[in-house]
Amino acid sequence: MLRDTYIGLVDDSFIGKHVKLAGWIDSIRDHGGVLFIDLRDKEGKLQAVLEESGNKELYDIAKHFKEESVVLVEGLVRRRPSGTENPKIKSGNVELLIERIELLNASETLPFPIDDNVDISEELRLKYRYLDLRRPKFQKAIKTRSKALKITRDFFEENGFYEIETPFLIKSTPEGARDFLVPSRLHPGKFYALPQSPQLFKQILMISGFDRYFQIARCFRDEDLRSDRQPEFTQIDFEMSFVEEQDIMEISEKLLSKLFLELLDIELSTPFKRITYKEAMERYGSDKPDTRFGLELVDLSDIFKNTNFNVFKSAIEQKGIIKAIKINKILSRKEIDNLTEYVKGLGAKGLAWGKIENGEFSSPIAKFLTEEEIKAMLSRLEAKDQDMIFFSADKPKNVYKILGNLRLQLGKMLNLIDESKFAFLWVVDFPMFEYNEEEGRLEAMHHPFTSPKTEDLDKIKYIVDKSDKEDIINIGENIGARAYDIVLNGVEIGGGSIRIHKQDIQKLVFKILNITDEEAAMKFGFLLEALKYGAPPHGGLAFGFDRLMAMMLGFDSIRDVIAFPKTQKGTCLLTGAPDVVSDKQLKELHIKIT
């Protein structure tokens, strides 16, 4: 080894010892005859001192070294002079008196300083990601990620799970997003797909009798990217046989409790709160509600069922709803206009509002409402002086979208969110299907392998043979799924379900989703075949590991907790991927670019 120990591990116990260290020059300062060189490696920093009086030749060479150059140093560890200690670092009581220094590799002038407090464009950061990763906060993030993976593996091993790798080159079975396709050289015209999840393989592992499986799974989805999306990402994936929803939830809570305790020294209160999908939508306008603050939606539909106000009347006649949010502050005209533009961006035609000043309700819509309606509305909202109310009247789906997002916007705007809090929540009792208006059909709310609730199996069998579209939609949207999502601070960090383990039920679900027998056999024939040979009841869950790490460490984007992330356009600025390939490579793959 070139070194005796790590730079950041040198402390009081090394006083009086000669050591050999290797690392980077974090900073270098010339104090006229004395060079102060802060050395750095993965464990931390250490101040080193080179005195001109001790070795002028070495001093004259070292004073020209640049920051971030790599050096090998030897010297004596001594106590720092009284009053110069640095309590912020482990080595803050000591320093290294340099007797020898060797430049292992010089650094050119950096495109940006290695400093957490400097604002750097993300484009520049990702181009020089290896420099960006030297910054303390990203060193901490990647190290914490590594520790989290170890904790996760240890946890599952202690609980009787097997870590089993599933294939990367698989059959294309789209699960919602587009697949990344890989052409086969040996089978011209045929393609592998990269897995969007290990879903089918982990179910087959349960059929194989392994009982408990887990994997730190790499997943790939060719989709439009946002701050919480990457084309390749990591999941903590697990599956269990002979279980019910409660069993999956308990193991999930235990894992999260272990991660939070060991990484953040935070003790989580379990079991986590549970809320049904219906309640989440009605109260918060979202199936992943942020429960760190109030501003719940209030239903006013019954109050305005006989109203003459055309906007509300039209909504009721079209089987819509009327809901409102109340805040304890009267906003300025400019703030109201900004919120109006915001909800218009979500598809709203406008934003109806009202306020209470000096005990009087005033609103642009007040003249269309009766005194009885206003009185009943204010009573339902428990409104008082200096309160403001925002309304939405439309189909339930649209109202929830508008008010759910408006609620979050108001929460941030009014500083109602406690950013130091971790609010966990299980959302349960999801519908099995939802209606896709564009395609005019039912689609799976989670995925087609989710088991329906036992009490709704007859509905599944009933609508398969129905031809009346409205009947199919009405019944289909009221079939419950044995699905569950885990939400943290308004972000879904994991989701799962009890799976279908009987072939006949799986075939019926495929039919409801307009997947023909031929298409099902072509895409999922291997699963249907496996379900014939004694498949046990089973279920599982997958955590979005990148997202979980970002939230635990206080980052807004998952890109900050991934060593080499892609941009929002799916490019790697470090390597230049994706890129063109040679004609020879394309020819071998029997591919022509047009």
Swiss-Prot record:
Coiled-coil spans in chain: none
Localization in the cell: Cytoplasm
Primary site of residence: cytoplasm
Gene Ontology biological process terms, A to Z: aspartyl-tRNA aminoacylation
Entry keyword set: Aminoacyl-tRNA synthetase, ATP-binding, Cytoplasm, Ligase, Nucleotide-binding, Protein biosynthesis
Transmembrane segments: none
GO molecular function: aspartate-tRNA ligase activity; aspartate-tRNA(Asn) ligase activity; ATP binding; nucleic acid binding
Record flagged with keyword Disulfide bond: no
Aspartate: annotated span: 199-202
Enzyme Commission numbers on file: 6.1.1.23
Reactions this protein catalyses: tRNA(Asx) + L-aspartate + ATP = L-aspartyl-tRNA(Asx) + AMP + diphosphate
Binding site for ATP: 221-223, 230, 492, 544-547
PANTHER family tied to this protein: ASPARTATE--TRNA LIGASE, MITOCHONDRIAL, ASPARTYL/LYSYL-TRNA SYNTHETASE
Family: Belongs to the class-II aminoacyl-tRNA synthetase family. Type 1 subfamily.
Xref: NCBIfam families: aspS_bact, PRK00476.1
Assembly: Homodimer.
Name of this chain's protein: Aspartate--tRNA(Asp/Asn) ligase
Protein source organism: Hydrogenobaculum sp. (strain Y04AAS1)
